[in-house]
Amino acid sequence: MIDWVKVRKECKRLGIFPKGFWNPLHCNFEECGIQMLLSERSVGKTTGILLVGMVLNSLYGVRIHYIRNTKNMLRESIVSDLFSTIISCGYVSKVTNGRYNSIRYVKNERKWYYILQDEDGIMIEQAPECLMYAMSVDNADNYKSGYSCPTADWIIVDEFISTQEYQTNNFLPLNDIFSTLIRFRDSATIIFLANTIHIEHFIFYEYAIQDQVKSLQYGDSKIYESPLGTKIYIEFIKDKEVSRKKQNVNKRYFGFNNKKLSAIRGGNWIVSNYPHIKLTSENSKLLFNRIYVETKGMLINISIYQSKDIGLIA
């Protein structure tokens, strides 16, 4: 079992979370097996979570698992630099007590390894076991029978919110991956990370926390418990240093009274934009108004109009 007091003390001893930057050590890892961390970009969520995973690897031999929605998102050009900040800050040497000084991504294995390299960047030694393994939701069926890891106690689901892809069928295969990794252990932690703050994302409805999430304000953190007792820690991250820098950028480029820019400016949910048709008694006729559709836990009333210009409208 992971001793989180010990983990936090080790992180502080190593000095890998400098003051003025967001770090995840305040998150409720003891009580909640699922964490959802939401923010704008450049807060340092992924780097912070990877650093904690590295400390868990050092203390307990934990293998980090990094999950994206599709195999295409695991291209070397996308994921090879995940540890770049950690490497450049010299944290690899700190966490490994000088044994290694860099991290290498092996493309054909989809694994990251600690390595020791000389001043010219030539590899001298590679760790025998990988630090992190990459997985994709669209490959979930293959993991069921072909993969197991008894130390998969740090599971990262990166960029879980996307406005570009249809993901509503991802929930079951994603949880299949969790089940494959966790097996019968209760020591694992699942961390969802998002740079797009979309209040209507399907995952909130699948976990039946959509109403609670909608009440979150910038800087809030809360614990939600399901009727069956599963606890989720969710945080809408507010980083003071990032917010200060954002103010200047927003004033120069995004200072418009337009809700569509809310998520770009930071501190608010992204707003979905839908076209609306103006209807008047002169250009349309109401045909039905007692049609109801149940979706995402809500009952929506739909009215059908006959328009003179474009026909039937719902």
Predicted regions mapped to residue ranges:
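Phosphate/NTP-binding elements of NTP-utilizing enzymes
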Residues: 2-314
